[in-house]
Amino acid sequence: SGVLCAFNLIDLAGYAGEAGIGFNGSFTPHILATDTLYCGDMTLYAYAKSGIDQETVVGKFLNDVCHYTLEFQHLDNDSSNPFKAKFHVENGRVVPECTFGTGELKGLIASADENEPIAGARIRIYSGETLGENLVRTIYTDETGNYSVDNLTAGTYSIEIAATGYKKYDMQVEITENATVYNETLLMIGRNGEDGVGTVTGELKDALTGLPIQDMTYNIRKDWNNTTGAVLETGTFDASTYELSLNPGNYTLEIIKENYITNHINIAVVLDETKTYNVTLSPENSSIDTDNLRIVLTWGEYPWDLDSHLYGKDKLTDSDVFHTCYWAKNYYQGSTAIAKLDVDDTTSYGPETTTIYELNDNMKYSYYVHDYTNGYSSSSTAMAASGAKVQVYAGNVCYFTFNVPNEGGIWWHVFDYDSATDALTPVNAMSYSN
């Protein structure tokens, strides 16, 4: 260094160094979002470099004659830099990752006592399973209590629901790409009377037969869609009906019975009121393996009669091969059962169960629900308010749960299924004609 200092005095050679903070970024406007989403990917990094000064005799000689630059890059914008940070910005706010996707979430928020829509309720949506971290969106219900959020990436989201005068609670939802997920109606409990109790009651039924079942274990957890959290209460149901008294609030009721697939239902307990929540369990059955499907429809007290319709269509000719429903419950090829309407319920609640016993790769299957009670209406919204739910089982696992959209209609096209590709495509379309 002493020699370089001496050379520097006569401008023969010099050593130069430079350090600082570097920044770069790219911006993308997602114009397909309902409200244009401006995304930016930013990088902030420390840089440092040193070398022979290019303005000295030696520096100029190396550069002009030898075409060589003696320079050392100590820190740069590369993967080896320990002093480097990347972050994503959306509309001026830092978020963990880009939230633009093709998934959508819709639903309705209403009071649990009167089932009246709640306007201005707040919904905070967090990416992942931890509430309070990675806030993605904050939205509010409109004057009809409805909400909608689009452009969500596929994955698990934690949702916090709050409204003035009501108890706050949370739940988790799964968003899939290129599909609209409809939440069941989010019921809210008033803050008054937190020390009182309310009652929930219901019947316990076999999904395959529609007959009563008994002798099962139950667990109660706080909030909705909570299948793994701390258990607040546990016990047994010895009879085919049950009754529980709980403090007002939102809970997840887990039902466990030997040789049956465990089921979870969301319940809302209202002060000094009794609410009905029937429970349906699908039996474990080796004849329903992972190559076949069981579809279970349940709903509330009204309408009295919702009907299941399963269509099997030839993919090459686009023509119907079979249609199972209440007037044609079974479809056989020879002595082989292909599809059956196992249970047809006409007196509220369900279950109404359809099973595909033999899948055919040359066919496409479509499942519909029809509001038979209001079958000739061109304006009914009764099915939308019914709390109807469709669960799809393969083997001993419930793979899909569909909640009825909050839209008018007497036909609900729930999903299509292609057994050749094993692709179940949510449709969730409501209409007044099939």
Pin down the residues of each PLM region.
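Short Pro-Gly-centered beta-turn/loop motif in secreted/extracellular proteins
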Residues: 30-38, 146-156, 164, 238-252, ...
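Short, acidic Ser/Thr/Gly-rich low-complexity loop/linker segments typical of extracellular
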Residues: 127-148, 212-216, 222-245
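Intrinsic-disorder/low-complexity signal
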Residues: 275, 279-434
